[in-house]
Regions:
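Positively charged n-region of N-terminal signal peptides that target proteins for export
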Residues: 1-4
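Short glycine-rich His-centered loop
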Residues: 18-42
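Periplasmic-binding protein-like
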Residues: 24-26, 103-107, 191-206
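Ligand-binding cleft/hinge of the Venus flytrap
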Residues: 47-56, 99, 123-127, 135-158, ...
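Acidic, polar ligand-binding/catalytic clefts
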Residues: 48, 61-125, 139, 200-202
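Short helix-initiation/N-cap motifs at beta->coil->alpha
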Residues: 59-71, 154-169
Length: 206
């Protein structure tokens, strides 16, 4: 995924005049809130180090909803975003850098008991199954096109962290997630041994 650090680094004198507000979506271990509500994580450390070196004050706000993050960005609430996935229509109000600071490996997750039952060679193999997707996430052209096809059974929710819980509860059958995000949640919520991944596919833009 990509962030908007490049623009700010080009304008250090202007930026030093006020506090920068940086928005992001909760995505442990990259960005999360500790028990006191303070932002933590690899992305947080990155921007804190960069702007600390520039003597630029920052405030980081982490949300659980990608749709809310996008609305706030479009409305001018934030000066920068942390790791907001690319969509062409967002270029009307966001400046994306040409280089991504991190790349994710995405897989389709299933319940461990269903691993031998759910076959996945092409996306069409998933038509019989309920697929969880997250509102306002940027998916590949193939997956985005499938979401408009009534032959598929997509379920859209606003909060990505609910996807694995829905999967465990049997409310969906398959969900595309990044390995970093999914494994962090699996470890945090004690879901080891309950979920597995299908063969790797480029399911989502990162």
């Amino acid at each position: 995924m990509r962030s908007l650090l490049v623009l700010c680094l080009l304008l250090p004198c202007w930026l030093s005049a006020r506090e920068l507000i940086i928005g992001g979506i909760l995505e442990p271990p990259l960005k999360w809130l500790d028990h006191s509500g303070q932002p933590r994580g690899l992305d947080v450390d990155l921007v804190t180090t960069i702007f600390g070196g520039l003597k630029v004050p920052i405030r980081i706000e982490l949300l659980d909803s990608g749709a809310r993050l996008t609305r706030n960005a479009e409305g001018g609430v934030y000066d920068l975003l942390l790791s907001h996935s690319y969509k062409p229509e967002r270029e009307s109000y966001l400046l994306y850098p040409t280089q991504a600071h991190i790349r994710h490996s995405w897989h389709f997750f299933v319940r461990k008991d269903d691993l031998g039952k759910i076959r996945y060679r092409t996306l069409a193999d998933l038509k019989p199954w309920r697929i969880g997707v997250t509102k306002d996430f940027s998916y590949t052209q193939e997956l985005t096109a499938a979401m408009a096809d009534p032959a598929y059974r997509f379920q859209v929710i606003p909060i990505n962290q609910l996807q694995l819980r829905k999967l465990i509860a049997g409310r969906i059958d398959v969900v595309p997630m990044s390995l970093v995000t999914a494994f962090a949640q699996i470890r945090e919520e004690g879901l080891e041994g309950k979920l597995d991944v299908t063969v790797h596919r480029d399911g989502v833009d990162s």
